[in-house]
Amino acid sequence: MTQVSVVTPASAEVIQLGPTRMRILEDGRTTGHRLGIGEITLPPRTPGPPQHRHARHDEGFYVVSGAARFTVGETTYDAAPGTLVMIPPGAPHTFANLGDEPTVLLNTFTPDLYVQYFRDLGQLIACGEPLTPENTIEAMSRYATTPATDYA
């Protein structure tokens, strides 16, 4: 029988990355690694990562609640609940919560490659290492992702 995945609010894997929380909803095991899904919660006034590019996966963001600002190269998009932002491979991007309310984003990865990146960052923190630009870039590099230094 085909396996079905049901992830409840209490059963999701949770990775705390400083003030940002990532809940892993699908890590690729059920989808043959074609799709990964996470839920990102950004507290008010929380920046995201520096602009970066993924070489081997698409990334999607669906705004569930709150508001987010997406920066893609030099262009910004203010996204209200119900907005979907799809980032193709190679596009420089970042996101942030500039508002006074928490922002919840449904985050997709096709294929699921980037789920392990968040686990790697969580492991660094669990081992007592602070996240630095150097160790974050090193972790990114394992998943075909590079900083978009031309938009730093």
Q: PLM features: residue spans?
A:
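Hydrophobic ligand-binding cavity/cleft-lining segments
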Residues: 1-15
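Short acidic-glycine-tyrosine-enriched beta hairpin
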Residues: 8, 74-92
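A short glycine-rich, His/Asp/Glu-containing loop-to-beta-strand
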Residues: 13-51, 57-58
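Structural motif
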Residues: 21, 60, 67-69, 76, ...
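Short, conserved beta-strand element in jelly-roll/cupin
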Residues: 39-43, 53-72, 108
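Short beta-strand segments
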Residues: 49-51, 72-77
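Ligand-binding loop in jelly-roll beta-barrel domains
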Residues: 69, 89-115
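Acidic/histidine-enriched, glycine/proline-rich intrinsically disordered or flexible terminal extensions
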Residues: 119-152
